[in-house]
């Protein structure tokens, strides 16, 4: 019986699921925009939102908490130097999930996950 079990299993073991979401968090922190399936995007919110909240206060203990989940020095560095100060005034809701159609092959619903307040890169070559 699965009473009071929250979250999805994605037909993976717990260690595989933990590694998958750790890698997805690192990719989102590095690129600030990723494309994945809709259920994974919805579950990714449970992992990335607390990480960004922890990164608002830059201390050794909070860096260690983030590294325990991410296992990537570069991702932790960007999280605390760029994203923490960027979201300092925002009380939550750090990511946006946008539905973007269905995947060819298995027709899985896809979504784009992006960080809010992402800097827009403009093309100045047109002028």
From Swiss-Prot:
Keyword Endoplasmic reticulum assigned: no
BP terms from Gene Ontology: translation
GO cellular component: cytosolic large ribosomal subunit
SUPFAM superfamilies with a match to the protein in the record: Prokaryotic ribosomal protein L17
Domain of life: Bacteria
Gene Ontology MF terms in the entry: structural constituent of ribosome
InterPro entries in the cross-refs: Ribosomal_bL17 (IPR000456), Ribosomal_bL17_CS (IPR047859), Ribosomal_bL17_sf (IPR036373)
Gene3D superfamilies for the chain: Ribosomal protein L17 (3.90.1030.10)
Keyword Magnesium among record annotations: no
Keywords, alphabetical: Ribonucleoprotein, Ribosomal protein
Pfam families: Ribosomal_L17 (PF01196)
NCBIfam families named among the record's database cross-references: L17
PANTHER family reported for this sequence: LARGE RIBOSOMAL SUBUNIT PROTEIN BL17M (PTHR14413:SF16), RIBOSOMAL PROTEIN L17 (PTHR14413)
UniProt family annotation: Belongs to the bacterial ribosomal protein bL17 family.
Subunit structure: Part of the 50S ribosomal subunit. Contacts protein L32.
HAMAP family xrefs: Ribosomal_bL17
Protein name: Large ribosomal subunit protein bL17
Originating species: Legionella pneumophila (strain Lens)
Gene: rplQ
